[in-house]
Swiss-Prot record:
Region of interest called G4 motif, as start-end residue ranges on this chain: 184-187
Modified residues (Phosphoserine): S27, S416
N-acetylalanine: modified positions: A2
Protein's recorded name: Septin-6
Family assignment from sequence similarity: Belongs to the TRAFAC class TrmE-Era-EngA-EngB-Septin-like GTPase superfamily. Septin GTPase family.
Keywords: Acetylation, Cell cycle, Cell division, Cell projection, Centromere, Chromosome, Cilium, Coiled coil, Cytoplasm, Cytoskeleton, Differentiation, Flagellum, GTP-binding, Kinetochore, Nucleotide-binding, Phosphoprotein, Spermatogenesis
Annotated InterPro entries: G_SEPTIN_dom, P-loop_NTPase, Septin
Sequence ranges assigned to domain Septin-type G in this UniProt record: 39-305
Coiled coil, from the record: 321-407
Chief site of localization: cytoplasm
Post-translational modification N6-acetyllysine, affected residues: K367
Organism from which the protein derives: Mus musculus
Underlying gene: Septin6
Length: 434
Protein backbone atom coordinates (compact mmCIF):
# COMPACT_ATOMS: atom_id res chain seq x y z
CA UNK A 1 0.00 0.00 0.00
CA UNK A 2 1.39 3.44 -0.95
CA UNK A 3 1.99 5.99 1.78
CA UNK A 4 -0.40 8.44 0.11
CA UNK A 5 -3.20 5.89 0.40
CA UNK A 6 -2.90 5.57 4.18
CA UNK A 7 -5.56 7.48 6.10
CA UNK A 8 -6.24 7.94 9.79
CA UNK A 9 -9.86 7.97 10.94
CA UNK A 10 -10.84 9.75 14.14
CA UNK A 11 -14.61 9.88 13.74
CA UNK A 12 -17.40 10.50 11.29
CA UNK A 13 -16.20 14.07 10.69
CA UNK A 14 -12.54 13.19 10.22
CA UNK A 15 -10.59 14.31 7.18
CA UNK A 16 -8.45 12.17 4.93
CA UNK A 17 -4.98 13.66 4.92
CA UNK A 18 -2.54 12.53 2.25
CA UNK A 19 1.03 11.98 3.38
CA UNK A 20 3.79 13.84 1.60
CA UNK A 21 6.27 11.06 2.20
CA UNK A 22 7.06 7.89 4.10
CA UNK A 23 6.40 8.14 7.84
CA UNK A 24 6.97 4.61 9.06
CA UNK A 25 3.84 3.43 10.83
CA UNK A 26 3.31 0.89 8.08
CA UNK A 27 5.76 -1.24 10.06
CA UNK A 28 3.29 -1.61 12.95
CA UNK A 29 2.19 -5.11 11.83
CA UNK A 30 5.82 -6.19 11.75
CA UNK A 31 6.37 -4.72 15.21
CA UNK A 32 3.33 -6.55 16.53
CA UNK A 33 4.45 -9.82 14.96
CA UNK A 34 7.97 -9.51 16.37
CA UNK A 35 6.66 -8.68 19.84
CA UNK A 36 4.17 -11.55 19.76
CA UNK A 37 6.84 -14.00 18.60
CA UNK A 38 9.20 -12.90 21.36
CA UNK A 39 6.48 -13.30 24.01
CA UNK A 40 5.26 -16.62 22.67
CA UNK A 41 1.72 -17.94 22.56
CA UNK A 42 -0.44 -20.12 24.74
CA UNK A 43 -3.19 -22.49 23.69
CA UNK A 44 -5.36 -24.56 26.00
CA UNK A 45 -7.34 -27.59 24.85
CA UNK A 46 -10.00 -29.40 26.84
CA UNK A 47 -10.61 -33.01 25.78
CA UNK A 48 -14.01 -34.28 26.88
CA UNK A 49 -15.14 -37.81 26.18
CA UNK A 50 -15.67 -41.24 27.61
CA UNK A 51 -12.80 -43.48 28.58
CA UNK A 52 -11.15 -45.34 25.71
CA UNK A 53 -12.05 -42.99 22.84
CA UNK A 54 -8.42 -42.16 22.04
CA UNK A 55 -8.18 -38.62 23.43
CA UNK A 56 -4.49 -38.83 24.36
CA UNK A 57 -3.60 -40.54 21.09
CA UNK A 58 -5.31 -37.84 19.04
CA UNK A 59 -3.40 -35.11 20.92
CA UNK A 60 -0.12 -36.89 20.20
CA UNK A 61 -1.12 -37.18 16.56
CA UNK A 62 -2.22 -33.54 16.23
CA UNK A 63 1.07 -32.12 17.47
CA UNK A 64 3.23 -34.92 16.09
CA UNK A 65 4.84 -35.67 19.42
CA UNK A 66 4.54 -37.99 22.38
CA UNK A 67 3.22 -36.08 25.37
CA UNK A 68 4.50 -37.50 28.62
CA UNK A 69 2.02 -37.47 31.46
CA UNK A 70 1.03 -39.38 34.54
CA UNK A 71 -1.20 -42.35 33.76
CA UNK A 72 -4.76 -41.72 34.86
CA UNK A 73 -6.51 -44.02 37.30
CA UNK A 74 -10.15 -44.75 36.56
CA UNK A 75 -11.10 -45.78 40.08
CA UNK A 76 -12.27 -42.32 41.16
CA UNK A 77 -15.92 -41.98 42.24
CA UNK A 78 -16.38 -38.87 40.07
CA UNK A 79 -14.93 -36.99 37.13
CA UNK A 80 -11.39 -35.67 37.65
CA UNK A 81 -9.72 -33.06 35.42
CA UNK A 82 -6.05 -33.62 34.72
CA UNK A 83 -4.03 -30.71 33.32
CA UNK A 84 -0.59 -30.93 31.70
CA UNK A 85 1.38 -28.04 30.18
CA UNK A 86 4.08 -28.43 27.53
CA UNK A 87 6.45 -25.97 25.83
CA UNK A 88 6.56 -26.56 22.07
CA UNK A 89 8.74 -24.91 19.45
CA UNK A 90 8.12 -24.78 15.71
CA UNK A 91 10.59 -22.72 13.66
CA UNK A 92 11.03 -19.61 15.83
CA UNK A 93 7.51 -19.66 17.31
CA UNK A 94 7.03 -20.88 20.87
CA UNK A 95 3.75 -22.35 22.07
CA UNK A 96 2.81 -23.11 25.66
CA UNK A 97 0.26 -25.87 25.17
CA UNK A 98 -2.02 -27.03 27.98
CA UNK A 99 -4.05 -30.21 27.55
CA UNK A 100 -6.83 -30.88 30.05
CA UNK A 101 -8.34 -34.37 30.12
CA UNK A 102 -11.55 -35.49 31.80
CA UNK A 103 -10.57 -38.63 33.67
CA UNK A 104 -13.47 -40.94 34.49
CA UNK A 105 -16.02 -39.09 32.36
CA UNK A 106 -18.91 -41.46 31.62
CA UNK A 107 -17.59 -44.21 33.91
CA UNK A 108 -20.18 -43.69 36.65
CA UNK A 109 -23.48 -45.51 36.89
CA UNK A 110 -25.23 -42.23 37.70
CA UNK A 111 -23.96 -39.75 35.11
CA UNK A 112 -26.36 -36.94 36.02
CA UNK A 113 -23.69 -34.62 37.46
CA UNK A 114 -20.76 -35.63 35.25
CA UNK A 115 -20.65 -32.20 33.60
CA UNK A 116 -20.39 -30.21 36.85
CA UNK A 117 -16.64 -30.67 37.50
CA UNK A 118 -15.95 -29.56 33.90
CA UNK A 119 -18.07 -26.41 34.23
CA UNK A 120 -16.49 -25.61 37.59
CA UNK A 121 -13.00 -26.01 36.13
CA UNK A 122 -13.73 -23.65 33.21
CA UNK A 123 -15.27 -21.08 35.55
CA UNK A 124 -12.27 -21.36 37.88
CA UNK A 125 -9.92 -20.39 35.02
CA UNK A 126 -12.14 -17.41 34.15
CA UNK A 127 -12.22 -16.38 37.80
CA UNK A 128 -8.42 -16.56 38.10
CA UNK A 129 -8.02 -14.31 35.05
CA UNK A 130 -10.66 -11.88 36.35
CA UNK A 131 -8.91 -11.63 39.71
CA UNK A 132 -5.66 -10.86 37.92
CA UNK A 133 -7.42 -8.15 35.90
CA UNK A 134 -8.90 -6.57 39.02
CA UNK A 135 -5.55 -6.27 40.79
CA UNK A 136 -4.10 -2.81 41.31
CA UNK A 137 -0.73 -3.98 40.01
CA UNK A 138 -1.47 -6.24 37.08
CA UNK A 139 1.09 -8.35 35.25
CA UNK A 140 -1.07 -9.73 32.45
CA UNK A 141 1.87 -9.76 30.02
CA UNK A 142 3.58 -12.44 32.13
CA UNK A 143 0.42 -14.10 33.46
CA UNK A 144 -0.09 -17.68 32.30
CA UNK A 145 -3.52 -17.64 30.71
CA UNK A 146 -5.18 -20.93 31.66
CA UNK A 147 -8.59 -20.19 30.10
CA UNK A 148 -9.82 -23.00 27.87
CA UNK A 149 -9.67 -21.94 24.22
CA UNK A 150 -11.30 -24.98 22.66
CA UNK A 151 -13.15 -28.08 23.78
CA UNK A 152 -12.72 -31.14 21.60
CA UNK A 153 -15.78 -33.21 22.40
CA UNK A 154 -15.21 -36.87 21.56
CA UNK A 155 -18.34 -38.71 20.44
CA UNK A 156 -18.45 -42.50 20.61
CA UNK A 157 -18.83 -44.08 17.13
CA UNK A 158 -22.17 -45.76 17.84
CA UNK A 159 -23.59 -44.93 14.42
CA UNK A 160 -27.01 -44.22 15.88
CA UNK A 161 -27.43 -40.97 17.81
CA UNK A 162 -25.90 -38.85 20.52
CA UNK A 163 -26.11 -40.09 24.08
CA UNK A 164 -28.05 -38.05 26.61
CA UNK A 165 -24.81 -37.46 28.51
CA UNK A 166 -23.25 -35.87 25.42
CA UNK A 167 -26.22 -33.59 24.76
CA UNK A 168 -26.49 -32.43 28.37
CA UNK A 169 -22.75 -31.81 28.71
CA UNK A 170 -22.42 -29.87 25.44
CA UNK A 171 -25.50 -27.80 26.32
CA UNK A 172 -23.92 -26.84 29.64
CA UNK A 173 -20.58 -25.98 28.00
CA UNK A 174 -21.59 -24.14 24.81
CA UNK A 175 -21.84 -20.74 26.53
CA UNK A 176 -18.47 -21.17 28.26
CA UNK A 177 -16.13 -22.61 25.64
CA UNK A 178 -15.70 -23.14 21.90
CA UNK A 179 -16.92 -26.68 21.21
CA UNK A 180 -15.67 -28.69 18.24
CA UNK A 181 -17.35 -32.11 18.17
CA UNK A 182 -15.35 -35.01 16.73
CA UNK A 183 -16.37 -38.59 16.10
CA UNK A 184 -13.64 -40.64 17.74
CA UNK A 185 -12.31 -43.87 16.22
CA UNK A 186 -14.38 -43.26 13.12
CA UNK A 187 -12.81 -46.30 11.41
CA UNK A 188 -15.10 -48.44 13.57
CA UNK A 189 -18.10 -47.76 11.30
CA UNK A 190 -18.58 -47.80 7.55
CA UNK A 191 -18.57 -44.69 5.35
CA UNK A 192 -22.30 -44.84 4.71
CA UNK A 193 -23.05 -45.23 8.41
CA UNK A 194 -20.62 -42.41 9.17
CA UNK A 195 -22.36 -40.02 6.76
CA UNK A 196 -25.76 -40.80 8.31
CA UNK A 197 -24.27 -40.48 11.79
CA UNK A 198 -22.93 -37.00 11.01
CA UNK A 199 -26.33 -35.86 9.75
CA UNK A 200 -28.03 -37.31 12.84
CA UNK A 201 -25.57 -35.59 15.19
CA UNK A 202 -25.99 -32.22 13.47
CA UNK A 203 -29.78 -32.56 13.58
CA UNK A 204 -29.80 -33.41 17.29
CA UNK A 205 -27.45 -30.54 18.13
CA UNK A 206 -29.70 -28.07 16.32
CA UNK A 207 -32.94 -29.45 17.78
CA UNK A 208 -31.51 -29.28 21.31
CA UNK A 209 -30.13 -25.76 20.87
CA UNK A 210 -26.47 -26.70 21.31
CA UNK A 211 -24.21 -23.98 19.89
CA UNK A 212 -20.96 -25.47 18.58
CA UNK A 213 -18.03 -23.43 17.29
CA UNK A 214 -18.44 -22.27 13.69
CA UNK A 215 -15.28 -21.46 11.78
CA UNK A 216 -15.41 -17.71 10.97
CA UNK A 217 -16.34 -16.65 7.44
CA UNK A 218 -16.04 -12.87 7.85
CA UNK A 219 -12.34 -12.87 6.92
CA UNK A 220 -11.99 -13.04 3.16
CA UNK A 221 -8.66 -14.84 3.36
CA UNK A 222 -10.19 -17.87 5.10
CA UNK A 223 -13.92 -17.50 4.46
CA UNK A 224 -14.02 -20.02 1.63
CA UNK A 225 -12.14 -22.81 3.39
CA UNK A 226 -13.93 -22.20 6.69
CA UNK A 227 -17.32 -22.19 5.01
CA UNK A 228 -16.49 -25.50 3.38
CA UNK A 229 -15.21 -27.04 6.62
CA UNK A 230 -18.29 -25.96 8.57
CA UNK A 231 -20.25 -28.34 6.37
CA UNK A 232 -17.98 -31.24 7.42
CA UNK A 233 -18.66 -30.91 11.14
CA UNK A 234 -18.49 -33.04 13.20
CA UNK A 235 -15.09 -34.28 12.06
CA UNK A 236 -14.60 -38.04 11.90
CA UNK A 237 -11.07 -38.63 13.16
CA UNK A 238 -8.58 -41.43 13.66
CA UNK A 239 -5.42 -41.02 15.72
CA UNK A 240 -2.19 -42.98 15.57
CA UNK A 241 1.49 -42.38 16.32
CA UNK A 242 2.54 -45.62 14.64
CA UNK A 243 4.30 -45.22 11.30
CA UNK A 244 3.57 -47.80 8.60
CA UNK A 245 5.37 -48.17 5.30
CA UNK A 246 2.92 -47.67 2.45
CA UNK A 247 4.57 -47.87 -0.93
CA UNK A 248 7.85 -46.04 -0.57
CA UNK A 249 6.69 -43.72 2.22
CA UNK A 250 6.34 -44.02 5.97
CA UNK A 251 2.92 -42.80 7.05
CA UNK A 252 1.03 -42.64 10.31
CA UNK A 253 -1.67 -45.23 10.08
CA UNK A 254 -3.60 -47.94 11.86
CA UNK A 255 -3.22 -51.49 10.60
CA UNK A 256 -6.05 -53.99 10.67
CA UNK A 257 -6.41 -57.49 9.25
CA UNK A 258 -8.66 -56.08 6.55
CA UNK A 259 -6.41 -53.16 5.61
CA UNK A 260 -4.74 -49.92 6.69
CA UNK A 261 -6.33 -46.62 7.75
CA UNK A 262 -4.07 -43.70 6.91
CA UNK A 263 -4.43 -40.91 9.45
CA UNK A 264 -3.49 -38.12 7.02
CA UNK A 265 -5.47 -39.45 4.08
CA UNK A 266 -8.60 -37.31 3.74
CA UNK A 267 -10.33 -40.17 1.95
CA UNK A 268 -9.99 -42.25 5.14
CA UNK A 269 -10.82 -39.70 7.88
CA UNK A 270 -11.10 -35.98 8.70
CA UNK A 271 -7.92 -35.74 10.77
CA UNK A 272 -6.22 -33.36 8.32
CA UNK A 273 -9.33 -31.15 8.25
CA UNK A 274 -9.34 -30.98 12.04
CA UNK A 275 -5.64 -30.14 12.21
CA UNK A 276 -5.97 -27.43 9.55
CA UNK A 277 -9.00 -25.83 11.16
CA UNK A 278 -7.80 -26.14 14.74
CA UNK A 279 -4.15 -25.21 14.41
CA UNK A 280 -3.16 -23.69 11.08
CA UNK A 281 -6.22 -21.54 10.25
CA UNK A 282 -8.31 -20.75 13.34
CA UNK A 283 -6.13 -21.05 16.44
CA UNK A 284 -5.97 -17.27 16.91
CA UNK A 285 -9.72 -16.92 16.34
CA UNK A 286 -10.35 -19.52 19.03
CA UNK A 287 -8.20 -17.50 21.41
CA UNK A 288 -10.01 -14.28 20.49
CA UNK A 289 -13.46 -15.88 20.80
CA UNK A 290 -12.55 -17.18 24.24
CA UNK A 291 -11.57 -13.70 25.41
CA UNK A 292 -14.13 -11.58 23.55
CA UNK A 293 -17.17 -13.84 23.93
CA UNK A 294 -16.97 -16.45 26.66
CA UNK A 295 -14.74 -14.63 29.12
CA UNK A 296 -16.57 -11.33 28.58
CA UNK A 297 -19.88 -13.06 29.32
CA UNK A 298 -18.46 -14.49 32.55
CA UNK A 299 -16.86 -11.14 33.46
CA UNK A 300 -20.08 -9.21 32.80
CA UNK A 301 -22.14 -11.58 34.95
CA UNK A 302 -19.64 -11.41 37.81
CA UNK A 303 -19.41 -7.61 37.70
CA UNK A 304 -23.19 -7.31 37.59
CA UNK A 305 -23.37 -9.56 40.63
CA UNK A 306 -20.94 -7.19 42.34
CA UNK A 307 -23.20 -4.23 41.45
CA UNK A 308 -21.25 -2.70 38.57
CA UNK A 309 -23.13 -1.41 35.53
CA UNK A 310 -22.54 0.77 32.47
CA UNK A 311 -25.78 2.78 32.49
CA UNK A 312 -28.23 4.09 35.07
CA UNK A 313 -31.99 3.35 34.96
CA UNK A 314 -32.38 6.22 32.46
CA UNK A 315 -29.83 4.59 30.10
CA UNK A 316 -27.30 7.33 30.77
CA UNK A 317 -23.59 6.46 30.95
CA UNK A 318 -22.51 5.37 34.39
CA UNK A 319 -18.83 5.74 35.27
CA UNK A 320 -16.88 3.38 37.50
CA UNK A 321 -16.66 6.08 40.18
CA UNK A 322 -20.42 6.60 40.08
CA UNK A 323 -20.93 2.85 40.24
CA UNK A 324 -18.60 2.67 43.23
CA UNK A 325 -20.37 5.54 44.99
CA UNK A 326 -23.79 4.07 44.26
CA UNK A 327 -22.68 0.67 45.52
CA UNK A 328 -21.08 2.27 48.56
CA UNK A 329 -24.23 4.25 49.36
CA UNK A 330 -26.31 1.14 48.82
CA UNK A 331 -24.03 -0.80 51.13
CA UNK A 332 -24.13 1.95 53.77
CA UNK A 333 -27.91 2.05 53.48
CA UNK A 334 -28.10 -1.70 53.94
CA UNK A 335 -25.65 -1.44 56.83
CA UNK A 336 -27.75 1.23 58.54
CA UNK A 337 -30.86 -0.81 57.90
CA UNK A 338 -29.20 -3.86 59.40
CA UNK A 339 -28.00 -1.81 62.37
CA UNK A 340 -31.52 -0.45 62.90
CA UNK A 341 -32.96 -3.95 62.61
CA UNK A 342 -30.39 -5.25 65.09
CA UNK A 343 -31.10 -2.33 67.43
CA UNK A 344 -34.83 -2.97 67.23
CA UNK A 345 -34.21 -6.64 67.76
CA UNK A 346 -31.98 -5.85 70.74
CA UNK A 347 -34.59 -3.51 72.23
CA UNK A 348 -37.28 -6.12 71.66
CA UNK A 349 -35.18 -8.79 73.30
CA UNK A 350 -34.41 -6.47 76.22
CA UNK A 351 -38.12 -5.80 76.64
CA UNK A 352 -38.89 -9.49 76.46
CA UNK A 353 -36.15 -10.21 78.98
CA UNK A 354 -37.41 -7.46 81.28
CA UNK A 355 -40.91 -8.88 81.03
CA UNK A 356 -39.54 -12.34 81.82
CA UNK A 357 -37.58 -10.97 84.79
CA UNK A 358 -40.62 -9.05 86.06
CA UNK A 359 -42.74 -12.15 85.73
CA UNK A 360 -40.10 -14.16 87.53
CA UNK A 361 -39.86 -11.45 90.22
CA UNK A 362 -43.64 -11.47 90.60
CA UNK A 363 -43.63 -15.25 90.95
CA UNK A 364 -40.84 -15.02 93.53
CA UNK A 365 -42.76 -12.40 95.52
CA UNK A 366 -45.90 -14.52 95.40
CA UNK A 367 -43.92 -17.54 96.47
CA UNK A 368 -42.28 -15.51 99.25
CA UNK A 369 -45.65 -14.23 100.47
CA UNK A 370 -47.06 -17.74 100.34
CA UNK A 371 -44.14 -19.16 102.26
CA UNK A 372 -44.27 -16.25 104.71
CA UNK A 373 -47.97 -16.88 105.30
CA UNK A 374 -47.31 -20.57 105.81
CA UNK A 375 -44.50 -19.69 108.19
CA UNK A 376 -46.75 -17.37 110.18
CA UNK A 377 -49.48 -20.00 110.32
CA UNK A 378 -46.99 -22.61 111.50
CA UNK A 379 -45.59 -20.13 114.00
CA UNK A 380 -49.08 -19.39 115.33
CA UNK A 381 -49.83 -23.10 115.60
CA UNK A 382 -46.61 -23.63 117.50
CA UNK A 383 -47.35 -20.67 119.78
CA UNK A 384 -50.85 -22.04 120.44
CA UNK A 385 -49.41 -25.44 121.21
CA UNK A 386 -46.79 -23.84 123.45
CA UNK A 387 -49.51 -21.86 125.24
CA UNK A 388 -51.58 -24.99 125.76
CA UNK A 389 -48.49 -26.81 126.98
CA UNK A 390 -47.67 -23.98 129.38
CA UNK A 391 -51.24 -24.02 130.69
CA UNK A 392 -51.06 -27.79 131.16
CA UNK A 393 -47.72 -27.42 132.93
CA UNK A 394 -49.11 -24.72 135.21
CA UNK A 395 -52.18 -26.84 135.99
CA UNK A 396 -49.92 -29.83 136.64
CA UNK A 397 -47.76 -27.76 138.95
CA UNK A 398 -50.84 -26.55 140.80
CA UNK A 399 -52.17 -30.08 141.18
CA UNK A 400 -48.75 -31.23 142.29
CA UNK A 401 -48.52 -28.45 144.85
CA UNK A 402 -52.02 -29.24 146.13
CA UNK A 403 -51.17 -32.92 146.39
CA UNK A 404 -47.97 -32.19 148.24
CA UNK A 405 -49.88 -29.88 150.58
CA UNK A 406 -52.50 -32.52 151.28
CA UNK A 407 -49.82 -35.10 151.84
CA UNK A 408 -48.03 -32.79 154.19
CA UNK A 409 -51.19 -32.04 156.13
CA UNK A 410 -52.03 -35.72 156.32
CA UNK A 411 -48.62 -36.52 157.70
CA UNK A 412 -48.92 -33.84 160.35
CA UNK A 413 -52.40 -35.08 161.43
CA UNK A 414 -51.24 -38.70 161.74
CA UNK A 415 -48.29 -37.68 163.89
CA UNK A 416 -50.51 -35.76 166.32
CA UNK A 417 -52.81 -38.74 166.87
CA UNK A 418 -49.89 -41.05 167.59
CA UNK A 419 -48.48 -38.70 170.20
CA UNK A 420 -51.91 -38.41 171.77
CA UNK A 421 -52.23 -42.21 172.04
CA UNK A 422 -48.83 -42.58 173.53
CA UNK A 423 -49.67 -39.99 176.10
CA UNK A 424 -52.95 -41.66 176.94
CA UNK A 425 -51.24 -45.01 177.37
CA UNK A 426 -48.77 -43.51 179.61
CA UNK A 427 -51.47 -42.02 181.78
CA UNK A 428 -53.71 -45.14 181.66
CA UNK A 429 -51.77 -48.44 182.05
CA UNK A 430 -54.85 -50.52 181.40
CA UNK A 431 -54.80 -49.36 177.81
CA UNK A 432 -51.45 -51.08 177.35
CA UNK A 433 -52.93 -54.40 178.71
CA UNK A 434 -55.51 -54.25 176.11
Amino acid sequence: MAAADIARQVGEDCRTVPLAGHVGFDSLPDQLVNKSVSQGFCFNILCVGETGLGKSTLMDTLFNTKFEGEPATHTQPGVQLQSNTYDLQESNVGLKLTIVSTVGFGDQINKEDSYKPIVEFIDAQFEAYLQEELKIRRVLHSYHDSRIHVCLYFIAPTGHSLKSLDLVTMKKLDSKVNIIPVIAKSDAISKSELAKFKIKITSELVSNGVQIYQFPTDDESVSEINGTMNAHLPFAVVGSTEEVKIGNKMMRARQYPWGTVQVENEAHCDFVKLREMLIRVNMEDLREQTHARHYELYRRCKLEEMGFKDTDPDSKPFSLQETYEAKRNEFLGELQKKEEEMRQMFVQRVKEKEAELKEAEKELHEKFDRLKKLHQEEKKKLEDKKKCLDEEMNAFKQRKAAAELLQSQGSQAGGSQTLKRDKEKKNNPWLCIE
